[in-house]
C-alpha cells in the first residue's frame, strides 16, 4: 500500500422519499461512489452510508393523495431508490431510512443533550396557519415574494433566486401551497436551537479547511448578516418524530435528516458487529467523516449540523464537499423538453457506465454546475471508452488467443509500462482531491499513447510475417498490460467494465498490483465489453421522458376539483349563447313547502324576474335583499309547483351551508351583461 490505512465514513445527502431519483440526483451519488471506491481500491477502511429522508409535511400530504399510510409509501420509495442506485453501480455499504429506531434514539439523544446544555429555547410564536386545511404551514408550504430580492413564487424558508434565508412571515403576499388560501397568523409554542451561541466555533471550523473556499466565503456573508435562532419544531399534524416531553410537537425534518447519517451508520455497525460506532462519531475520534452534498443545502450542513454535533458532544465532519446543479443541453432540466430524465428512464435506454464516465470527465472540486450535453455525451463516450480504451484490447487480444495459446509474453522493453505506472501517484492525488475531470484527462492521454504504440507497431501486419511472430507477441502483450493499467485507474468510475476486464485477465485489478509481472499469464478469449452510444437511443430516452411527463402531468387534485372535476370542454359558440346579467335582489322569501328553496324577485334593469334558488340552507332571506348578484337571463322558464322560475342565479360551493351567491363589485348596475 502506498500509505497507512485510514478509517473513513463517507455520505451523500439523503434523497427525499416522495419521488423517484433523476439524473440531477445521480451526479452526487456517482461522485461520492467514485471517491468511496477509490479509497477502498487504495486499501483504506471506507464505509459509504446513505438513507432515505423520510419525514416532513410533503411526505404526509403525498401519502394522503395516494391513499396510503406514510410508512407504506416511504417503504415503497425506499425499494425503488435502492434499485435505481444498484443499477447505476452505486455501492452503498448501508442504505437505511430516517424513519428508524436508530434515528429516533439519536435524534432524541442529541436534542436532550442540547436542551441540558442550555441550547434549546422555548417561545411562543405567531405562525402562518391554513384556515382551509386547519394546519400550521411549514416554511416550504408557504409561497410568496422574496423579501430580499423580490423574486416571486419563492418558498417560505429560502429564496432560490438570491439564496437568502428568512421566516415564512417575512414573505410578501404569502399563500398556502397546500390549498392556495391566504394564511392567517396563529400563536403556537416552538423550540429553538440557539445557533448564535456557536458562532465562534463555527467561524473557526468553516475556515479550518473543512469547506471549499467558495462555501467558506458564502458563509462569511451569513456571519455578517448575523446568525439566528433556528426553529426546530413543527406542529401536528406532521409525519416525523415527536419531541421528548412535548406532545403534539415534532422535530423539523432538517433536525433529524442529517442525524440520519449517524442512524444509518449505527444500523450498519449493529448489523456488522465488528465496527465501533463511537470510533467514528466520538468527540475525540481520529476517523474521517466526509459529507458530499449539493450547493443548495450548504447552510444546513455547514452551520446547523456542526453546531448540533458540537453542542451534543460529538465530532464535527472532517469536510463537507458541495457540487453544483446539473443542466441538460445548457439549460435547466425541463419536463416539457424531455430533459428532466429519471434514473429509471435512463437505465431503460442506456448503459449506466456511460453516465458515470461522462460525469467523472466533467467533475472538479469546485461548485460549478455541470452540463449534460447529450450530443457531447455520445461523442465523448464513443471516443474515449469505445474508440480508445476498449479498442486497445479488441485490436490485440485476438492475436494472443489465436496465435500464442492465450498467454502473454514477457515484455522485453518495459519503458512504456513504466511510464504508465509513473502516473499512479498523480492520478491518485486527483481522485483524492475530487478532481475527476483532470484524472480522466490524464488517463485518456495515456490511452492515446497506448493506441499510438499499437498503430505504429501494427501487429496485424506483423502476424503475417513468419519472422515477426515474437515481435507481434511482444506488441500485443505490451498493449494488454497497458490496457490493464488503464482499466485499473478507471475502476472507481467503471466498476462493471472493470469486472469484465478482471474476468478477461482472470485476475483482480488492484492498485497495489499495478506493476504485476504477467509473463506467461493466460487470458480468457476476448468478448465485446462496451457498445457505442447510439443517438437514436438517446433520442428515445428524451422522448420517453416526455411520455412519462404526459402520464404524470395530471396532478392528484385536492380541494374542490377533487370532489367536483371540471366539466367537458365546450366551444366558444356554446358559451356565447348564455346571457348573464347583473340582477338586483328586490325581495327574497322562504318557500314554506320546500326545504331548499328561496323565492327571489330580481330586477334586471327595467324587468323583474321571479327565480327559485336552492340556497335556503346558506342564507336568511332578509340578508339577500338589496344585494346584487348574477343570473342566467335567457334560460327557458321552468314551471314548478310553487310558481314559474324565470332564470337562475349563480352560486359557488358544494352545498348546504357552503353556498356563496356571486356578487359583482361595486359600480355594477342591474341589467349589465356579464361577459
Swiss-Prot record:
It comes from the Bacteria. Zn(2+) binds at residues 146, 149, 159, 162. Its main location: cytoplasm. ATP binds at residue 335. Binds 1 zinc ion per subunit. Its EC number is 6.1.1.10. It catalyses: tRNA(Met) + L-methionine + ATP = L-methionyl-tRNA(Met) + AMP + diphosphate. Pfam families: Anticodon_3, tRNA-synt_1g, tRNA_bind. Its cofactor is Zn(2+). The keyword Aminoacyl-tRNA synthetase applies. Signal peptide: none annotated. A motif ('KMSKS' region) lies at residues 332-336. GO terms for cellular component: cytosol. Keywords: Aminoacyl-tRNA synthetase, ATP-binding, Cytoplasm, Ligase, Metal-binding, Nucleotide-binding, Protein biosynthesis, RNA-binding, tRNA-binding, Zinc. This is Methionine--tRNA ligase. GO terms for molecular function: ATP binding; metal ion binding; methionine-tRNA ligase activity; tRNA binding. Is required not only for elongation of protein synthesis but also for the initiation of all mRNA translation through initiator tRNA(fMet) aminoacylation. One of its GO terms (biological process) is methionyl-tRNA aminoacylation. The keyword Transcription regulation does not apply. Residues 574-675 form the tRNA-binding domain. Homodimer. It is found in: Cytoplasm.
Amino acid at each position: 500500500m502506498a500509505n497507512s490505512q485510514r478509517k473513513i465514513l463517507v455520505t451523500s445527502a439523503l434523497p427525499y422519499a416522495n419521488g423517484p431519483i433523476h439524473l440531477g440526483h445521480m451526479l452526487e451519488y456517482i461522485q461520492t461512489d467514485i471517491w468511496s471506491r477509490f479509497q477502498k481500491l487504495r486499501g483504506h477502511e471506507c464505509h459509504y452510508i446513505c438513507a432515505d429522508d423520510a419525514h416532513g409535511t410533503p411526505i404526509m400530504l403525498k401519502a394522503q393523495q395516494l391513499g396510503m399510510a406514510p410508512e407504506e409509501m416511504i417503504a415503497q420509495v425506499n425499494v425503488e431508490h435502492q434499485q435505481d442506485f444498484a443499477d447505476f453501480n452505486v455501492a452503498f455499504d448501508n442504505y437505511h431510512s430516517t424513519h428508524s429506531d436508530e434515528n429516533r434514539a439519536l435524534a432524541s439523544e442529541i436534542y436532550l443533550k442540547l436542551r441540558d446544555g442550555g441550547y434549546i429555547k422555548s417561545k411562543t410564536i405567531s405562525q402562518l396557519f391554513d384556515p382551509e386545511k386547519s394546519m400550521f404551514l411549514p416554511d416550504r408550504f408557504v409561497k410568496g415574494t422574496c423579501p430580499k430580492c423580490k423574486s416571486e413564487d419563492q418558498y417560505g424558508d429560502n429564496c432560490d433566486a438570491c439564496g437568502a434565508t428568512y421566516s415564512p412571515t417575512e414573505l410578501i403576499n404569502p399563500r398556502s401551497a397546500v390549498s392556495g388560501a391566504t394564511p392567517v397568523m396563529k400563536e403556537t409554542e416552538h423550540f429553538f436551537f440557539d445557533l448564535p451561541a456557536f458562532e465562534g466555533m463555527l467561524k473557526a471550523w468553516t475556515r479550518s479547511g473543512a469547506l471549499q473556499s467558495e462555501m467558506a466565503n458564502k458563509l462569511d456573508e451569513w456571519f455578517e448578516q448575523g446568525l439566528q435562532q433556528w426553529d426546530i419544531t413543527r406542529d401536528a399534524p406532521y409525519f416525523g418524530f415527536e419531541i421528548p416531553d412535548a406532545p403534539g410537537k415534532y422535530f423539523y425534518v432538517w433536525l433529524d435528516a442529517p442525524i440520519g447519517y449517524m442512524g444509518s451508520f449505527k444500523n450498519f455497525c449493529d448489523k456488522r458487529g465488528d465496527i465501533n460506532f463511537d470510533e467514528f462519531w466520538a468527540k475525540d475520534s481520529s476517523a474521517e467523516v466526509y459529507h458530499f452534498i449539493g450547493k443548495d443545502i450548504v447552510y444546513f450542513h455547514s452551520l446547523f449540523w456542526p453546531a448540533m454535533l458540537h453542542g451534543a458532544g460529538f465530532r464535527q465532519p472532517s469536510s463537507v464537499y458541495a457540487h453544483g446543479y446539473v443542466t441538460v443541453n445548457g439549460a435547466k432540466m425541463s419536463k416539457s423538453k424531455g430533459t428532466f430524465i429519471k434514473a429509471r428512464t435512463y437505465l431503460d435506454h442506456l448503459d449506466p457506465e456511460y453516465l458515470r464516465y461522462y460525469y467523472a470527465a466533467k467533475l472538479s472540486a469546485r461548485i460549478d454546475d455541470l452540463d449534460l450535453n447529450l450530443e457531447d455525451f455520445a461523442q465523448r463516450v464513443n471516443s474515449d471508452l469505445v474508440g480508445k480504451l476498449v479498442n486497445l484490447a479488441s485490436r490485440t487480444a485476438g492475436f494472443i488467443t489465436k496465435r500464442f495459446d492465450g498467454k502473454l509474453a514477457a515484455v522485453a522493453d518495459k519503458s512504456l509500462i513504466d511510464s504508465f505506472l509513473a502516473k499512479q501517484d498523480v492520478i491518485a492525488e486527483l481522485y483524492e482531491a475530487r478532481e475527476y475531470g483532470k484524472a480522466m484527462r490524464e488517463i485518456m492521454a495515456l490511452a492515446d499513447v497506448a493506441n499510438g504504440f499499437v498503430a505504429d507497431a501494427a501487429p496485424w501486419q506483423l502476424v503475417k510475417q513468419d519472422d515477426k511472430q515474437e515481435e507481434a507477441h511482444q506488441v500485443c502483450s505490451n498493449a494488454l498490460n497497458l490496457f490493464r493499467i488503464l482499466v485499473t485507474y478507471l475502476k472507481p468510475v467503471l466498476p462493471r467494465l472493470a469486472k469484465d476486464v478482471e474476468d478477461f485477465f482472470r485476475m483482480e485489478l488492484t492498485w497495489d498490483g499495478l506493476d504485476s509481472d504477467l509473463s506467461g499469464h493466460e487470458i480468457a478469449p476476448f468478448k465485446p465489453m462496451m457498445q457505442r452510444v447510439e443517438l437514436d437511443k438517446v433520442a428515445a430516452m428524451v422522448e420517453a421522458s416526455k411520455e412519462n411527463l404526459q402520464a404524470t402531468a395530471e396532478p392528484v387534485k385536492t380541494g374542490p376539483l377533487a370532489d367536483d372535476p371540471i366539466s367537458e370542454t365546450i366551444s366558444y359558440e356554446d358559451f356565447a349563447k348564455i346571457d348573464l346579467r347583473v340582477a338586483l335582489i328586490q325581495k327574497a322569501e322562504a318557500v314554506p313547502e320546500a326545504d331548499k328553496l328561496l323565492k327571489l324577485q330580481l330586477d334586471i334593469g327595467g324587468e323583474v324576474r321571479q327565480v327559485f334558488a336552492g340556497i335556503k340552507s346558506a342564507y336568511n332571506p332578509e340578508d339577500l335583499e338589496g344585494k346584487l348578484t348574477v343570473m342566467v337571463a335567457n334560460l327557458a322558464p321552468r314551471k314548478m309547483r310553487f310558481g314559474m322560475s324565470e332564470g337562475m342565479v349563480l352560486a359557488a360551493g358544494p352545498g348546504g351551508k357552503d353556498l356563496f351567491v356571486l356578487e359583482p363589485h361595486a359600480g355594477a348596475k342591474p341589467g349589465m351583461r356579464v361577459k
